[in-house]
């Protein structure tokens, strides 16, 4: 708590106080009730998940230990206990006097209640999904019951355990035979089944590691039945996964995803406090695209290519640096961007943050889904390796040319993802309201702001920045159309190639990343949508002289992650009620 008691020196508002943010004598802890409640919940949540998630020695936690935090599938006992936790904290929250809270703590109340309600809904959904696949794991209760008594060290009847696990192994093989002929198992059911089987493997492994070698009778009776059970569970999981592999792609892309549908998109947008429909977001993206088109033609003409923007883009792509030179090029671009931020006095950059960011190289297999560099504590650089095919090497180099990279190094490092991570670990650390609309939106916002501040040095740099702006427009359009069932993955790939100018391999990687691996449906549209939220708030506060650039940017970083509408509510002192509903229209639609 010592860090939470330090006073935050945040705003000195050019001769006038800005009551919306300097509302308490202790700016770092805006009140005691909400930080304490959320910290206690987070601690309770972590310890319960740890206790009710089994693990084995080779997955952490020691022999027969507890698992890493994982709120996903698990035993019915685990879900029931978490449900009691949620209900208990909802009661504690409702006992607070909302109207007596400070503005920041009202925002915390609203967001914490939102998240508790969401956890209750998701828990009910997970219980239904588990019930759906429970007939395929009728032996689960026996394994979980033994793991439960293991937690308190009860000595088992070793001969009984051996017989039980032998019988379960036979049962699994019978079920696997039935599964082979089963038709119509959904990808969600396959995921639930494989995760449940993995949890059962951990539960059985936890029991075995706890007693084996320590309990003489267990050590004599159980090792062989355990090995056979573990192998059977592994094979059973693989059989479920093969049901997904058998699912045919809808087109030649080979990408098998699962559109969530418009209704679920609307529900998630409401949760993220985005007050636009999917169709309205597509309209916004098209309006942004039109602006990009006009600016791209200006830069193309300046480069001497008339109206042939794709020819200008090709020239920019071919400015790539030789193999082995990309890390040096990234460092040069980083220094240019940080020097620009400091010269314009745009944001406070802690010296330690500048000192400790690192570099990594992206493995070639990861470049299939991350064809460009990524950021965070380190910047991970995508560039070709000796193991890649010639075409893939050239596409990687062309797609990561200096003008493309110059537009986004600040997105990944300072003042983007690296600074976000650095500051979130130091300010308002009790908040756990992370959202891609804040995380990706903030980093994208800097691309918009630096364009306005003439960061690009010439038409090639402008084309690099416009390429990424168009890319983010395209993400909104293709991801929403896909999840509403209107586009196939191949149509999304073709759209990126034809409309944005992507290398085809990079476009395939982008679409695969978006739809495979259970990426959240709204993630890809969060970049430009969140960026426009921060841009609109900048116009509202900095554009009107209420804050300087530095004050605004520092304030956002000190608040920690949350929906941008709540950042606005805090910084502009918007009226907040317990039953708050999203309503902020941060972008003027074209109609």
Residue ranges, per PLM feature:
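N-terminal maturation segment of proteins
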Residues: 23-591
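Bacterial Sec-dependent N-terminal signal peptides
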Residues: 1-28
């Amino acid at each position: 708590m010592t860090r939470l008691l330090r006073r935050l020196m945040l705003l000195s508002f050019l001769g006038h106080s800005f009551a919306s943010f300097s509302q308490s004598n202790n700016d770092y802890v805006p009140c005691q009730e909400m930080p304490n409640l959320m910290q206690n919940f987070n601690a309770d949540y972590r310890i319960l998940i740890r206790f009710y998630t089994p693990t084995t020695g080779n997955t952490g936690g020691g022999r027969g230990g507890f698992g890493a935090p994982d709120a996903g599938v698990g035993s019915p006992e685990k879900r029931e206990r978490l449900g009691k936790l949620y209900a208990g904290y909802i009661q504690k929250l409702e006992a607070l006097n909302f109207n007596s809270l400070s503005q920041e703590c009202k925002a915390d109340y609203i967001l914490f209640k939102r998240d508790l309600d969401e956890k209750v809904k998701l828990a009910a959904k997970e219980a239904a999904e588990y019930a759906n696949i429970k007939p395929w794991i009728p032996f689960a209760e026996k394994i979980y019951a033994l793991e439960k008594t293991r937690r308190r060290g009860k000595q088992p009847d070793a001969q009984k355990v051996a017989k039980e696990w032998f019988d379960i192994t036979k049962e699994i093989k019978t079920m696997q035979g039935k599964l082979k002929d089963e038709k119509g198992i959904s990808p969600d059911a396959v995921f639930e089944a494989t995760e449940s089987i993995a949890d059962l493997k951990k539960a059985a492994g936890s029991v075995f590691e706890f007693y084996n070698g320590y309990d003489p009778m267990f050590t004599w009776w159980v090792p062989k039945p355990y090995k056979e059970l573990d192998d059977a569970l592994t094979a059973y999981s693989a059989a479920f996964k093969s049901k997904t592999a058998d699912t045919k792609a809808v087109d030649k892309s080979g990408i098998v995803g699962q559109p969530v549908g418009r209704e679920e998109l609307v529900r998630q947008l409401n949760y993220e406090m985005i007050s636009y429909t999917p169709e309205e977001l597509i309209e916004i993206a098209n309006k942004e695209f039109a602006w990009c088109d006009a600016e791209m033609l200006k830069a193309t003409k300046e480069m001497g290519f008339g109206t042939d923007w794709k020819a200008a883009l090709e020239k920019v792509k071919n400015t790539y640096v030789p193999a082995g030179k990309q890390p040096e090029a990234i460092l040069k671009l980083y220094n240019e961007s940080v020097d620009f931020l400091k010269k314009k006095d745009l944001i406070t950059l802690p010296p330690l943050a500048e000192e400790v960011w690192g570099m990594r190289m992206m493995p070639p297999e990861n470049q299939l889904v991350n064809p460009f560099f990524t950021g965070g504590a380190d910047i991970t650089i995508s560039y070709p390796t000796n193991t890649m095919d010639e075409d893939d090497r050239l596409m990687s180099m062309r797609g990561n040319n200096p003008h493309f990279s110059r537009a986004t190094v600040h997105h990944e490092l300072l003042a983007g993802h690296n600074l976000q991570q650095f500051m979130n670990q130091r300010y308002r650390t009790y908040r756990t309201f992370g959202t891609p609309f804040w995380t990706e939106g903030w980093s994208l916002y800097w691309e918009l702001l630096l364009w306005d501040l003439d960061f690009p040095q010439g038409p090639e740099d402008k084309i690099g920045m416009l390429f990424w702006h168009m890319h983010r427009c395209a993400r909104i359009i293709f991801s929403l159309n896909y999840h509403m069932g209107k586009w196939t993955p191949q149509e999304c790939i073709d759209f990126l190639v034809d409309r944005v100018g992507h290398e085809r391999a990079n476009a395939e990687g982008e679409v695969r990343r978006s739809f495979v691996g259970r990426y959240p449906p709204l993630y890809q549209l969060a970049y430009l949508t969140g960026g426009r939220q921060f841009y609109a708030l900048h116009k509202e506060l900095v554009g009107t002289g209420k804050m300087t650039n530095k004050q605004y940017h520092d304030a956002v970083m000190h608040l920690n992650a949350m929906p941008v509408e709540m950042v606005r509510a805090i910084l502009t002192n918007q009226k907040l009620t317990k039953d708050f509903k999203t309503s902020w229209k941060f972008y003027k639609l074209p109609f």
